[in-house]
Amino acid sequence: EDCVACGMGKYSSVVGSPSSTTCQDCGAGKYLDSTGNDEETDCIDCGAGKYSDTVGAMVAATCVDCAAGTYLNTVGHALKADCILCDAGKYSSSEGATSENTCQNCPAGKYLETTGHDEVGDCVACVAGKYSSVSGSSSGTTCLDCVAGTYSNATGATSSETCEKCCEGKYSHTPGAVSFDACQDCSRGKYSGALGATSADTCQDCVAG
């Protein structure tokens, strides 16, 4: 009888086998799209950025892209869990990513404390009264208070320049103020010519006359 080739997704190194039972499946994380193969090494690894939990896979399409927010920089993986999450402070909208470089930093003025995010919209803006010049931040602690004597109602601020100074005749001893309302008037009969004053001590007695 004619010899029968092992089918796609299988191989056999047995010479003179009387049965197809000697044809073994390629393992998960691999596929084989040709017949008559005689070595396990003939099985083709799923590429970087992909995985497959299918045993005996016959086509490359069995290899599934790692989800956005993850990447995989090596080949032949069997599990979705093998895909590596982008670090905190980063995100990636790309499916099937093959490099950590695909994970982009959250922009300055924002942070992200958890891993595996897939869009920039997941990055959390610093609240009003704070700012951060740090990109790729994994903690809200990088959002710094506007100093006393200033305030800001902007979210996601990237610079202390966003913090506006209390005007003349006013002061504020409160860091992280979110409104002009934090600026208090000098008491009756006193004035201050200073911008961004932090204390009532800057308020001087009005000159008689």
Over which residues does each language-model region extend?
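Disulfide-rich, cysteine-dense extracellular ectodomains and adjacent flexible linkers of secreted
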Residues: 1-209
